[in-house]
């Protein structure tokens, strides 16, 4: 988002086929109230939004703290576990508790905060809001099988049942991102993966 954008800009973007905003907070708009107005316009025209969460990442970015995230009210709390520089855990807990929006845990983030976030979301009975991403390509590169590695991390160290961690990566993410996959439903695009339980 850039300063000076008005409602008609979002209408024009939607008419041109734009359906996703880049991360709120990486452009010139960083204040919560200003971002909230633009996020509302985007939502009005069917454009989904994600907000940067945590410390600066690219040149021109800055700290986006819990208060800005809550005020902006984007559809997805992007990389809640940071791009390695996560918010303090008590702030992550506040975001889980005070927002009703999707919570994105990423592979290229702080692993400890990612694990704790998944546990906290389960305690709050809001695991349906957890989605997974890689946050790549980023400064830490592109991780092959990053989503699978994140599923394994949450299932092994996060006390998340494996089938639930897979749901974060597939159905939850598809629902929040508006993807035509990730759920087994009539009319959806599907790949079939046959799995067996681990042998011990």
Feature-to-residue mapping (PLM):
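Metal-cofactor-binding active-site regions of metalloenzymes
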Residues: 1-5
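Generic non-transmembrane alpha-helix signal with a bias for helix starts/N-cap capping motifs
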Residues: 6, 35, 62, 89, ...
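Short glycine-/small-residue-rich flexible loop motifs, especially phosphate/cofactor-binding loops
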Residues: 10, 39, 66, 93, ...
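Phosphate/diphosphate-binding glycine-rich loops and adjacent basic-rich segments that engage nucleotide
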Residues: 13
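Active-site charged/polar residues at nucleotide-handling catalytic sites that mediate phosphoryl
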Residues: 16
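Active-site core of metal-dependent hydrolases
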Residues: 20-141, 158
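His/Asp/Glu-enriched, well-ordered alpha-helical/loop segment
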Residues: 119-197
């Amino acid at each position: 988002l850039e300063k000076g954008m008005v409602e008609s800009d979002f209408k024009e973007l939607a008419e041109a086929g734009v359906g996703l905003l880049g991360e709120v907070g990486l452009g010139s708009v960083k204040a919560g109230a200003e971002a909230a107005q633009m996020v509302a316009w985007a939502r009005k025209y069917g454009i989904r939004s994600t907000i940067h969460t945590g410390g600066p990442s690219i040149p021109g970015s800055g700290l986006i703290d819990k208060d800005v995230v809550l005020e902006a009210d984007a559809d997805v709390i992007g990389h809640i576990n940071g791009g390695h520089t996560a918010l303090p855990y008590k702030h992550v807990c506040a975001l889980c508790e005070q927002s009703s929006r999707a919570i994105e845990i990423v592979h290229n983030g702080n692993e400890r905060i990612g694990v704790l976030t998944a546990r906290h979301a389960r305690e709050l009975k809001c695991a349906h809001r957890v989605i997974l991403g890689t946050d790549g390509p980023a400064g830490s590169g592109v991780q092959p099988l990053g989503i699978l590695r994140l599923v394994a991390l949450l299932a092994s160290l996060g006390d998340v049942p494996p089938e639930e961690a897979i749901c974060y990566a597939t159905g939850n993410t598809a629902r929040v991102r508006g993807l035509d996959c990730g759920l087994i439903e009539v009319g959806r695009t599907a790949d079939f993966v046959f799995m067996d339980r681990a042998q011990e």
